[in-house]
């Protein structure tokens, strides 16, 4: 018979029975249980004789399943008891299945046969893996593999004597034929009962050694040859039985009272985060199963001599295909599912990454627009900062030059200062324009629904630098003014003088004055002195007289001599005067007045004296008056040279005691000489302060700028002599007095008042006679007019600057308030966005 027919005869089907079905159904080819060595030897001898017959070899597997029917019941009971003891010794470590075979004596023979399974369902059974995939460790797999190897070896050894019972073939063939025709689906039932292996394994231990010896002796060449054909399928079956996690016990519950593990929830745990570890575990299991291929030589020999290996070769190949497919599906489905989840997660991430650029495309464009605006704001601020730094450097250099250079280049410095101020104004205008431009850009950014807007000059550094630069220019201007005022060289302050010295000086001056000036009435005269009618007159050009005349356009003497003791004691007076003049420090000629236009005749002493004074001033360029020991140091300061000359002259007068409000003219030059004590219409701009160094008297300063020293005579004082009752000459002069304590400080915008001092002398007494020194006021009045205009201009410019600064501060404050409000609105919008 060919191999195909042989496989058809040997491939049989079993009835698909429920677990609580009829106990009369017989599991075909499942039980080969023999308890005596004698029976095993007899059956072995029988199979040796029929080994050459292929038909008998094909049928022996069918008949061997029912050999247990002829076994007496007592032997079966003993067999069950022995199996229980040996099973508890061998399988308590790994196979926790209670042995209830002790009750087999009370059951039927078919129940016992169902209880003891052969190796065939063991080899082709797929176990509990179809339902659950238990999670086992590598140590458990090693233990189970060792146990399964021992079970297979023992089972194969004990199964050889059970396979040769040809005499029972006739008894069971009719029933098996019916079963084969009516029960095609019983294979799956036998495959599920894989937990009943231990019975035959334990029962065959007693006959193990002799059965092996007999098999090794009685093997024929035909048997050996055919057993070689079934060796690889048996190895495949054993590999399947030994690989991995295929043997868990829990479905024999119907026939044995075993715990139902199928009702327990599966313990398969496949963490999603450890997807890579699962294939590695499978690979390890495969490697472990590959180790199981190295079977003991005893098992290999027993498999070589298995006569039914050819019978079940194709069947087990088919069974293997059926078994491996579900197990592979069970093992691979979770992995595939996990990989699918991984792939879907990756796809979702990829989709998110694709969506995020598209969704953020508008945002990125708007953000780039915002950054562009921010960068523009920073660039504008940086440009302004650079311009401010450059201008600041120039101003600092110019300030150093003012300190180092000579004071005779004021005009050039003034031009440079004006240029710097113009640059500063342009810079301020540029700053404001840039700020407005940045505000416009901010509004454009807000229209694009953006909340991130760059700030222009956030810390207000540029604005602060511009303000500092403006203050620096103001300081430079003040320094220039100070250098202009102090450009004339200062000489030592005079030594103390006495009234006698002053009297001698003025007496020498009075000797030069003519007895009577045309147009001026003459008054009474005392002995030793002459009454001067109106104008200071002098003859020869003496140095004290000239220097006294030089004093006229720059300063007016102011003295207070009220005590008679002061007349007897020398008064130490140190006077420091400061006056404005239109003359530059380098000695440039002063402005011309109406007195220059009229050529004075020698007969007019006033005109002659005025002309001489002008010539001397042009030569010297500075004024120093020496009247004996009385020295007056003049500090000339020329604020501006663009003032127009005043045509009025003669604002400093002398008058008689009886004719105070009279005015006269010079016949030659037509100079008008009014006699008013307060005839000055202009105010001096410069100041001087003086100290009284009288013994027993502290320094006294005028406490008010508008202080007036009322005109009085020496006879009004307490210790005045009767000769003082008749004043000889009253000289009214205008002075500019301010209150200073050690230093003089100009205060523009406030009008200076006039102070008058009158001096009287009696020619009968040795006290000094103060003659009115009428000095030309034309030049001084021109200087006063120009100084007044300069002061008004300075005041106006200061007020304009203050108003401009206040306006800038107001605009800055408004801008700051607006910026703060915008920032608060931005912060509120951001908070709302973060909340939602």
Curated annotation (Swiss-Prot):
Residues 159-172, 181-192, 227-248 have a biased composition (Polar residues). Residues 372-484 form a coiled coil. Residues 311-323 have a biased composition (Basic and acidic residues). Keywords: Coiled coil. InterPro entries: AKNA_Centrosome-Trans_reg, AKNA_dom. It comes from the Eukaryota. Residues 159-248, 303-325, 510-545, 575-596 are annotated as: Disordered. Belongs to the AKNA family. This is Protein AKNAD1. It comes from Homo sapiens. The gene is AKNAD1.
